């Protein structure tokens, strides 16, 4: 338990070189919730409509703030917005390959350090 607490504290205080992780963590709790929600849905192979993502983070920031953050994430190359072929009004969110690879590296490092 001490290893976990020490690692989390050190990892939180240190500046990470991974651009996507730095971006999501720099926006407080809602950025972290958005990051983990997107990755969880991606690895579960479940579609994530933008509206569901907004609702998952509204507890931590205003709707406008969350929508702006999602737009910045997309513009920054960390998220993909995919328009539905069936209903053009529906937009889905997926992580980019950069976000996936940096998360995978971060997760492996995390697991190694808490053993």
What do these predicted regions represent?
Residues 44-57:
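Short acidic, hydrophobic short linear motifs in intrinsically disordered regions
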Residues 98-115:
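Short, amphipathic alpha-helical interaction segments positioned at domain boundaries
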